[in-house]
Design a protein with these regions (language model features):
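Beta-strand->loop->alpha-helix junctions that form or flank phosphate-binding loops
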Residues: 46-53, 73-75, 180-183, 225
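Alpha-helix capping/helix-boundary segments
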Residues: 1-2, 29, 107
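Hydrophobic/anchoring residues in structured secondary elements
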Residues: 21-24, 179, 223-226
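Gly/Ser/Thr-rich phosphate-binding loop
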Residues: 6-67, 80, 87
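Conserved ATP/PPi-binding loop(s) of AMP-dependent carboxylate-activating enzymes
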Residues: 74-78, 89-121, 159
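Core-facing hydrophobic residues within beta-strands of well-ordered domains
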Residues: 16-19, 76-78, 174, 221
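AMP-binding/adenylate-forming catalytic core of the ANL superfamily
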Residues: 8, 104, 109-110, 117-120, ...
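Active-site glycine-centered loops adjacent to acidic/histidine catalytic or metal-binding residues
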Residues: 26, 50, 73, 132, ...
Length: 247
């Protein structure tokens, strides 16, 4: 949404001096988009986090922040968040990825008439397992790494689409992009990169050269595809599954 608005031809005709707060959520805000938004409006994006199961929100950055942090902020009052591993143990090492788990008054009681599905996502001590992988810094701020199910396993190495997209979004000539995992005979999975051009003259060779200089080898895309638009939900979240499923 922020990217689409900031790139709209009429965006610069608006006087943004009275814009006080811009709150981002729904999907991770890319640093390149946050910078573009700040440059054009003078108002930093304040990113928050929540899911349907934790409506409307579980964490947020301070609205008084003067710059984009790249984090989802701190848990809201009365809310507890932690990181857990695949066995349900708490991850306490700073910077170590784990699944974000949330406990608070906004967390659902369960899925309607689906006790089996509820049991899969609720821990014994009442935390909801979000399916999002995150890290926590020394201040207690959380940062989303990616959806657990979207992780790409390349020759045994974990590749998170968000980290690839964050880099490629800064490539000159790129409007927006998405990275997904596709089956590969040699590496098990490989990175597929789908790009919407800002510069119509952008070439695959330029994208690959940029990736070679900014991404480690196993994170570089095996396939680069250009499209006029990316499939999205009504609220603007990229539908990665449609990019994976399309042959």
């Amino acid at each position: 949404l922020f990217n689409g608005l900031a790139n709209h031809p009429d965006f610069n005709t608006v006087n943004w001096k009275n814009l006080k707060v811009a709150v981002g959520g729904g999907m991770a805000v890319q640093g390149a988009v946050a910078k573009l938004w700040l440059d054009k409006t003078g108002c930093p994006i304040c990113e928050g986090y929540g899911l349907s199961e934790t409506s409307p929100s579980a964490s947020c950055n301070p609205v008084t922040a003067t710059e984009f942090t790249g984090t989802i902020g701190l848990p809201l009052p009365g809310t507890s968040m932690k990181l857990i591993d695949d066995e349900g143990n708490e991850v306490t090492e700073l910077g170590q990825p784990g699944e974000i788990a949330i406990k608070g008054p906004q967390v659902m009681a369960g899925y309607w008439q689906r006790p089996d599905e509820t049991a899969k996502v609720m821990t014994a001590d009442g935390y909801f397992k979000t399916g999002d992988v995150g890290v926590m810094d020394e201040r207690g701020f959380f940062k989303i790494v990616d959806r657990k199910k979207d992780m790409i396993l390349v020759s045994g190495f974990n590749v998170y689409p968000n980290e690839v997209e964050e880099v490629v979004a800064n490539c000159p000539g790129v409007m927006e992009c998405a990275a997904v995992g596709v089956l590969d005979d040699k590496s098990g999975e490989a990175v597929k990169l789908v790009i919407v051009k800002k510069d119509p003259d952008l070439t695959e060779a330029q994208v690959r050269d940029y990736c070679r200089h900014n991404l480690t080898g196993y994170k570089q895309p095996k396939t680069v595809e250009f499209r006029t638009e990316l499939p999205k939900t009504p609220v603007g979240k990229i539908l990665r599954r449609e990019l994976r499923d399309k042959k």
